[in-house]
């Protein structure tokens, strides 16, 4: 399994694969690999084509699974209805499809095509970290086929960019004499990839913070910890631990239950299984100082999380959103991952600045780990038209242009190589990033045949 930031072995394999075929390749410090295949006779004068996808996959397994991603191989299976899945885990079709296509094309000497640059990138899933270290000056391509998506017969014209940001507040804990501890867990939320902000799902972190805020309006209490969420996912689970006097425990429980019922009613269609679990300890662990508790809770209350606006071109498509994805507490700090996101670069950068201003107001550190950029391209380019013609001839349908509220590496390459004529060609797969991830095998075959024919015609 090729987890993000753990791509060394798959990069070794790709390099060895290229070497055994006698193909030129390069590898950088982030384990991004480029393999070059010469043009077949008669195609030497054609423009160079880049094929591109990422090698890393999301590691996710069922709650009761003992699978060890570090040491076990993915256990694949084919279902009776024609899907490729894994036992108990993600199967890696995101973006294993691209890796498989490129390896097959590199190996097949019967194909006709221009010179190819097959680009295998890393650490895409947590925030496009690998490609940030990629040197585009080594590429000669004028045409670009991205293969990171999830629906055949479409091409992605609009995608979002984002700031991968982190808030951090440092502190020294204090021992509170005679304080008890209440753990407040909100779980059972629906959750989804953060691209689906139009569903207006509840956020477990925001819900728990709302509960703590209203408890503090009724009784004195301090934060001990806040932990929850998973990166690139609308949080489904979060737990706060607070320190308070034992005499205030019943009131805190009452407030927690009341606020949970309010949030559950507000999200009765989207999150019907939202659940509150409360547990007590007679003696509280050391807590954050009062001023830190106040700043953290208030800032988290004020930070927007969710949909900002939608497209007028693609009805229902989110254009901008704020994504609060994970929060974690150590002995001396609390931090959370936050992602101002927009398909419009200027708006994304302004949302980032808004977030920075809020952090400054509450004396909280705000650091952007990296920016990645969306893209906005037109249908009807020469490469798009070839794609549309081939797909129609093979499948009887025209390509459907779409937009999506997620970022991928297309924006990076178009920003650094603005002359590229780009299409997105992908096989259909479902439930990416979950143990139910499955690849439509028939779609995988259709899209590969289409890709091979596109290369023959360009």
Residue spans for each PLM region:
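A non-catalytic alpha/beta surface segment that caps or lines the substrate-entry region
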Residues: 3-47, 402
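Active-site metal-coordination/substrate-binding segment of hydrolases
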Residues: 43-120, 124-126, 131-144, 151-152, ...
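Short, conserved charged micro-motifs
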Residues: 44-45, 246-255, 345-350
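Midchain, well-structured core segments that form catalytic/ion-binding scaffolds
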Residues: 74, 81-84, 125-126, 131-340
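Glycine/charged-rich beta-loop-alpha catalytic/anionic-binding loops adjacent to active sites
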Residues: 75-89, 189-190, 392-397, 429-432
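Active-site-adjacent substrate-binding region
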Residues: 195-228, 365, 369-371, 375-420
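His/Asp/Glu-rich mid-to-C-terminal helical/loop segments that flank catalytic regions of hydrolases
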Residues: 199-218, 249, 292-301, 308-312, ...
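Zn-dependent metallopeptidase/amidohydrolase metal-coordination segment
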Residues: 312-315, 319-339, 390-391, 395-453
């Amino acid at each position: 399994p090729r987890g993000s930031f753990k791509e060394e072995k798959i990069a070794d394999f790709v390099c060895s694969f290229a070497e055994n075929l006698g193909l030129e390749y390069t590898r950088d410090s982030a384990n991004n690999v480029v393999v070059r295949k010469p043009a077949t006779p008669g195609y030497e004068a054609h423009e160079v084509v880049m094929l591109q996808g990422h090698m890393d996959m999301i590691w996710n397994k069922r709650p009761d699974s003992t699978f060890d991603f570090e040491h076990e191989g993915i256990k694949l299976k084919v279902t009776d209805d024609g899907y490729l899945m894994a036992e108990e885990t993600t199967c890696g079709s995101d973006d294993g499809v691209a890796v498989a296509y490129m390896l097959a094309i590199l190996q097949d000497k019967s194909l006709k095509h221009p010179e190819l640059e097959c680009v295998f990138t890393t650490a895409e899933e947590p925030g496009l970290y690998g490609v940030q270290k990629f040197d585009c000056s080594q590429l000669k391509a004028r045409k670009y086929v991205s293969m990171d998506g999830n629906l055949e017969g479409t091409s992605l014209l609009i995608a979002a960019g984002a700031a991968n940001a982190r808030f951090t507040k440092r502190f020294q804990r204090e021992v509170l004499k005679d304080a008890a501890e209440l753990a407040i867990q909100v779980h059972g939320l629906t959750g989804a990839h953060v691209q689906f902000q139009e569903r207006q799902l509840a956020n477990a972190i925001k819900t728990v913070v709302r509960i703590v805020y209203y408890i503090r309006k009724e009784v004195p209490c301090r934060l001990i910890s806040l932990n929850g969420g998973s990166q690139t996912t609308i949080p489904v689970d979060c737990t706060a631990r607070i320190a308070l006097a034992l005499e205030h425990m019943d009131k805190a429980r009452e407030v927690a239950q009341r606020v949970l019922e309010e949030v559950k009613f507000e999200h009765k269609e989207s999150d019907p299984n939202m659940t509150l679990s409360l547990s007590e300890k007679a003696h509280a662990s050391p807590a954050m100082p009062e001023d830190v508790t106040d700043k953290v809770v208030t800032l988290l209350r004020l930070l927007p999380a969710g949909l900002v606006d939608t497209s007028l071109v693609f009805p229902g498509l989110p254009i901008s959103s704020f994504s609060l994805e994970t929060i974690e507490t150590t002995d001396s700090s609390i931090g959370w991952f936050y992602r101002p996101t927009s398909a419009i670069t200027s708006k994304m950068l302004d949302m980032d600045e808004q977030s920075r201003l809020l952090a400054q107001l509450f004396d909280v550190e705000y650091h952007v780990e990296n920016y990645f950029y969306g893209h906005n391209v037109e249908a009807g380019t020469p490469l798009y038209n070839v794609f549309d013609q081939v797909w129609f001839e093979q499948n009887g349908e025209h390509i459907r242009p779409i937009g999506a509220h997620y970022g991928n590496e297309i924006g990076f390459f178009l920003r650094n190589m603005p002359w590229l004529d780009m299409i997105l060609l992908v096989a259909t797969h479902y439930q990416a990033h979950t143990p139910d991830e499955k690849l439509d095998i028939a779609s995988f075959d259709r899209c590969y045949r289409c890709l091979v024919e596109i290369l023959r015609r360009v």
